[in-house]
């Protein structure tokens, strides 16, 4: 199949026009079109939430003493496994 000079020129023109239609990677138009970088959120726990472990994990005596101070309970223990970034033992009162 032999291409004529006109078909080669038309093909070249189409390819050149599509290359010019897309903005360059670092042009101001492409930078504006990008989404802004995500802002890192910081979370500060309220003062009451920091104290809710009652010694779990690590000090079951704090948990036991906490439960003894609650009316109707004889004591307490740390219940559940410690899984990093997922969960930690909680103070269970009996």
UniProtKB/Swiss-Prot annotation:
Subcellular location: Secreted; Target cell membrane
Disulfide pairings: 56-78, 63-91, 67-93
BP GO terms, sorted: defense response to bacterium; immune system process
Source superkingdom: Eukaryota
Residue segments, region Interaction site with membrane interface: 57-60, 83-90
GO molecular function, one term: lipid binding
Signal peptide feature range: 1-25
Record's keyword terms, sorted: Antibiotic, Antimicrobial, Cleavage on pair of basic residues, Defensin, Disulfide bond, Immunity, Innate immunity, Lipid-binding, Membrane, Secreted, Signal, Target cell membrane, Target membrane
Binding site for beta-D-GlcNAc-(1->4)-Mur2Ac(oyl-L-Ala-gamma-D-Glu-L-Lys-D-Ala-D-Ala)-di-trans,octa-cis-undecaprenyl diphosphate: 54-56, 66, 91
Chief location category: secreted
Function: Antibacterial peptide potently active against Gram-positive bacteria. May act by selectively inhibiting peptidoglycan biosynthesis through complex formation with the cell wall precursor lipid II (1:1 molar ratio) thus inhibiting cell wall synthesis. Shows remarkably activity against resistant isolates such as methicillin-resistant Staphylococcus aureus (MRSA) and vancomycin-resistant Enterococci (VRE) at the concentration of micromolar level. Does not act by destroying the membrane integrity, which is consistent with its nonamphiphilic architecture. Acts more rapidly than vancomycin.
Record family assignment: Belongs to the invertebrate defensin family.
Name of the protein in its database record: Fungal defensin scedosporisin-2
């Amino acid at each position: 199949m032999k291409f004529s000079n006109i078909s080669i020129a038309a093909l070249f023109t189409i390819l050149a026009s599509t290359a010019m239609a897309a903005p360059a990677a670092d042009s101001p138009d492409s930078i504006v079109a990008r989404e802004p970088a995500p802002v890192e959120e910081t979370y500060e726990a309220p003062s009451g939430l920091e104290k809710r472990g009652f010694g779990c994990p690590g000090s079951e005596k704090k948990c036991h003493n906490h439960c003894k101070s609650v009316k109707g309970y004889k004591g307490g223990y740390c219940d559940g496994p410690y899984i990093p970034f997922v969960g930690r033992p909680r103070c269970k009162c009996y």
